[in-house]
Amino acid sequence: MVKNNAGIVNMFEKRRTQTTTIPIIEIMREKRSEDLETEIVQGLQFDSLQLPQELLWDDAGQILFDDLCNSSTYYLTKKEKEILQKYSTDMAATIPEGSTLIELGCGSLRKTGILLSALEKSHKAVTYYALDVSQDSLENGLAQLHKGLGCLDHVELRGLWGTYEDAIAWLADQHPINVHNGITFLWMGNSMTNMHLAQAQSLLSRMTKTCIGSGIPCQILVSVDSCSAEDIVMGAYDTDSQPLKDFIMNGLKSANRILGKDVFCASDWTFGTVLDRVRHEVQVFYAPTRDVTIHIDSHPCKITKGEKIAVISSGKWPEPYFRSMLEGIGLQVLDLWRDSDQFYCMNPLPLICSFPG
């Protein structure tokens, strides 16, 4: 058991700090704003309208999501933090000496400090990379992480500025001698389930196969929310929640910034959430409060009052569902940790998976 974990977490309360000398590698291959503009236009031409979820994760969105994570009804962060505080020593034991730890979509890095502290106390030389699409969030998150952990003798902190796809391309260029003891991917916050099942399978498969193709052993430490209690789930995504509203509606501001003009007038839009029991996910969408016509270049799009535009989903995957997904791409669960309540349906489930053979 790692002592004083709560103290480590409390050091991250201040959001902004002066950036440190922690190296950040820019791995972004293309200007993401141009890609997003194309995705916005294309998404509004589909029969089922959609906007890219990356609109939610700009610099302002990262801060607003942090507010959501700290809200009273958002159980995911609390459960995951509890698991980390209880099992961080066990998790650290699965990460080899001299290996690389890459966190996918690192966000504020509050919870990460618990695991890195356990690695430091176990005297394991590990190189930690925080991957994020937001440069501002990455710089400030790493600075706060460095401040919270203090002087590190064994764990080295670095950053990767880019997307998941950029990370896969970057991994393909890594020589085994640089990561001879392998890579552990850390994917927390239930972020994997923001993708649909097939998308998550594809990303996991490509990450592991890229490592195997480069001769690099790898494993994945991932948290999954499998809560089936609908009142608890929908309480976390209550549309009356101001933190949730601020976070989701910021996505339209982000879209306007990407497009270079106010295409989405805030007063014309609201958002909603719905539980899809078949897909085991909460779906979040925008909807206009009146009939609107959106003009983007030569692509006018008429949207009727109440018509849904999907933006993000959050999976609530039961264990059999998740295991089946892994088996479909040749992965297997090696270990599993739950929170102390032992209510499976309420717990994010950190799992370690490896690529067999």
UniProtKB/Swiss-Prot annotation:
Identify which top EC class this enzyme belongs to: transferase
User: Does the keyword S-adenosyl-L-methionine belong to this entry?
Assistant: yes
Which terms does the record give in the GO molecular function aspect? Answer: methyltransferase activity
Transmembrane annotation, as ranges: none
Please tell me whether the keyword Calcium is annotated for this protein: no
Biological process (GO), any one: methylation
* Homology family: Belongs to the methyltransferase superfamily.
User: Which NCBIfam families does the annotation name?
Assistant: methyl_EasF (TIGR03439)
PANTHER family named in the record: ERGOTHIONEINE BIOSYNTHESIS PROTEIN 1 (PTHR43397), HISTIDINE-SPECIFIC METHYLTRANSFERASE SAM-DEPENDENT DOMAIN-CONTAINING PROTEIN (PTHR43397:SF2)
UniProt name for this protein:
N-methyltransferase dtpB
Q: Give the species.
A: Aspergillus flavus (strain ATCC 200026 / FGSC A1120 / IAM 13836 / NRRL 3357 / JCM 12722 / SRRC 167)
